[in-house]
């Protein structure tokens, strides 16, 4: 990348963009203008933690746009601006959330979002982006829910003794396990 000589002195600021400590060259982030293809600003940071905090709170997680931001459930900011493009990052995020697709990346194009949003179910070609959940634990939890409700009376009667004898090897949570 060619830089005009006047930028060389101002490219690296000496203060962290988050906490005003001395910045390091290896921790650098930037924002873009509303066209999303031009640099808006370059920020330097003292640590990865400061850079991550900036990236999660001051710019859009996906496109680095620095305005029209809202927070999302995943712990980062996304932009709501759709003035110059069909889908905002917020729209894309919620389409992916609805179809259980990967949230922290945006591997799809606008045409892909058209196909996904038009269909009620997710087309097969996008199944590779589905977030995998641990189905074994959810099956076990549903199987054990009946046992938990049956033992709730026993648990409430023995709640005082459970806290006192939690490390006692003779303490049995299940009455059927008690040796006779």
UniProtKB/Swiss-Prot annotation:
Acidic residues biased stretches: 137-146
Ranges for region Disordered: 114-180
Annotated Low complexity bias: 147-173
Positions with biased composition (Basic and acidic residues): 114-136
Protein name in the entry: Uncharacterized protein R890
């Amino acid at each position: 990348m060619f830089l005009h000589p006047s930028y060389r002195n101002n490219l690296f600021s000496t203060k962290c963009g988050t906490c005003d400590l001395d910045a390091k060259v290896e921790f650098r982030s930037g924002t873009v203008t509303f066209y999303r293809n031009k640099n808006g600003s370059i920020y330097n940071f003292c640590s990865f933690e400061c850079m991550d905090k900036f990236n999660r709170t001051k710019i859009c997680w996906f496109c680095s746009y620095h305005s029209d931001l809202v927070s999302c459930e995943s712990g980062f900011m996304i932009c709501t601006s759709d003035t110059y493009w069909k889908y905002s990052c917020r729209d894309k995020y919620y389409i992916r959330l609805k179809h259980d697709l990967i949230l922290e990346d945006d591997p799809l194009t606008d045409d892909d979002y058209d196909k996904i949003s038009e269909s009620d179910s997710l087309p097969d070609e996008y199944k590779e982006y589905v977030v995998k959940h641990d189905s074994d634990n959810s099956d076990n939890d549903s199987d054990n829910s009946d046992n938990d409700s049956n033992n709730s009376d026993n648990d409430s009667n023995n709640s005082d003794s459970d806290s006192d004898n939690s490390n006692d090897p003779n303490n049995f949570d299940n009455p059927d396990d008690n040796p006779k």
